């Protein structure tokens, strides 16, 4: 089946959803050779991935992942594609804590760094979080603390078959955009940052196909996979079963324009310190960008009805110390599992 799919892609023809499901299933089951995997993902990239193809791949990855079903009504993910090359600190990770402290349940999906100095898993470890939890423990985190971290390699074990060819190719492939689409908790709300402005509508339509209720797919026009504060941001919003695309300007919300240098991060330890300083009340451009992105998460999380209202709540959550409290609570709760895990071997 994979040979047939490769020859079709090489001719520049699109695959149907069922064809790509069959092809990716073959890869995830370990039935494809490294050469076939490399050819398949390269040919797909050259042709350009369609909404149907990305939807099909996301369905396969979701089906093969270890699932969690938190016993809460509605929860969101704040996970970007990464790979934007802007070397900012971990904005979406900071945002997850502000959203959780503001009353949104968060199932944060993430991994170690791919392109930056610090991925969400790296900075969470530097903050003191125990990320090595099984699905039952992550579910408990979401239900009891309001936030859980879904560490991708633990939940997506069948991805290991594609890891070698991906690494050896060293180019962006469909797997770079599948990560944020394959949250094993099947979150119904999402703030999803992408590295390319052409991806916002594409990804929003895929999320719609996957049954999302509300989402903002965002690309800062400075290249950031976040809502930026240096210029405008392209947003494709999923709401009421449709996709609406617009530009978001930070100055319209009373946020001062920053320079890219104002938002630079460092390694995991440095980024952890930046997040703690913001949560301890430090003002400035780094706090501003966390507030703006948190406003989007609170809006997608349905606890506020507009970005303006979200900004007010995000500021209140940080200023009152609730965001810091939520971070400390999460650190403590995730570490309470360590002794149990060690005892159970």
Curated annotation (Swiss-Prot):
SUPFAM superfamilies: Nucleoside phosphorylase/phosphoribosyltransferase catalytic domain, Nucleoside phosphorylase/phosphoribosyltransferase N-terminal domain
Residue numbers binding anthranilate 1: 80, 111
Gene Ontology CC terms, in alphabetical order: cytosol
Cofactors demanded by this protein: Mg(2+)
Binding site for anthranilate 2: 166
EC number: 2.4.2.18
Binding site residues for Mg(2+) 1: 92, 226
Reactions catalysed: N-(5-phospho-beta-D-ribosyl)anthranilate + diphosphate = 5-phospho-alpha-D-ribose 1-diphosphate + anthranilate
MF-aspect GO terms: anthranilate phosphoribosyltransferase activity; magnesium ion binding
Binding site for 5-phospho-alpha-D-ribose 1-diphosphate: 80, 83-84, 88, 90-93, 108-116, 120
GO biological process, one term: L-tryptophan biosynthetic process
Binding, Mg(2+) 2: 225-226
Pathway the protein takes part in: Amino-acid biosynthesis; L-tryptophan biosynthesis; L-tryptophan from chorismate: step 2/5
Family affiliation: Belongs to the anthranilate phosphoribosyltransferase family.
Biological role: Catalyzes the transfer of the phosphoribosyl group of 5-phosphorylribose-1-pyrophosphate (PRPP) to anthranilate to yield N-(5'-phosphoribosyl)-anthranilate (PRA).
PANTHER family for this protein: ANTHRANILATE PHOSPHORIBOSYLTRANSFERASE
Cross-referenced NCBIfam families: trpD
Protein name: Anthranilate phosphoribosyltransferase
């Amino acid at each position: 089946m994979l040979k047939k799919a490769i020859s079709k892609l090489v001719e520049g023809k699109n695959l149907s959803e069922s064809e790509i499901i069959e092809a990716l299933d073959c890869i995830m089951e370990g039935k494809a050779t490294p050469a076939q995997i490399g050819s398949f993902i390269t040919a797909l990239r050259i042709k350009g991935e369609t909404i149907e193809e990305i939807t099909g791949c996301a369905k396969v990855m979701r089906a093969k992942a270890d699932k969690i079903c938190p016993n809460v009504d509605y929860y969101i993910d704040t996970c970007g594609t990464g790979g934007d090359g802007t070397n900012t600190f971990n904005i979406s990770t900071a945002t997850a804590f502000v959203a959780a402290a503001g009353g949104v349940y968060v199932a944060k999906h993430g991994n170690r760094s791919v392109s930056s100095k610090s991925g969400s898993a790296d900075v969470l470890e530097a903050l003191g979080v125990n990320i090595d939890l099984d699905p039952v423990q992550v579910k408990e985190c979401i239900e009891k603390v309001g936030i859980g971290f879904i560490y991708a390699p633990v939940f997506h074990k069948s991805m290991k078959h594609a890891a070698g060819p991906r690494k050896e190719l060293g180019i962006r492939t469909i797997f770079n955009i599948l990560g944020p689409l394959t949250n094993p908790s099947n979150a119904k709300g999402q703030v999803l940052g992408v590295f390319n402005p052409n991806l916002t509508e594409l990804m929003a339509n895929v999320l719609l196909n996957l049954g999302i209720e509300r989402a903002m797919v965002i690309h800062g026009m400075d290249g950031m996979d976040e809502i930026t504060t240096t210029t405008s941001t392209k947003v494709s919003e999923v709401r009421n079963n449709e996709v609406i695309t617009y530009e978001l300007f930070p100055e319209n919300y009373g946020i001062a324009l920053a320079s890219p240098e104002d938002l630079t991060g460092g390694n995991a330890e440095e980024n952890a310190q930046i997040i703690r300083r913001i949560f301890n009340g430090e003002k400035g451009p780094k706090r501003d960008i966390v507030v703006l992105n948190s406003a989007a998460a609170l809006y997608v999380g349905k606890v506020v009805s507009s970005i303006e209202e979200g900004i007010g709540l995000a500021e209140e959550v940080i200023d009152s110390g609730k965001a810091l409290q939520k971070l400390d609570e999460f650190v403590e709760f995730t570490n309470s599992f360590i002794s149990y895990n060690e005892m159970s071997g």
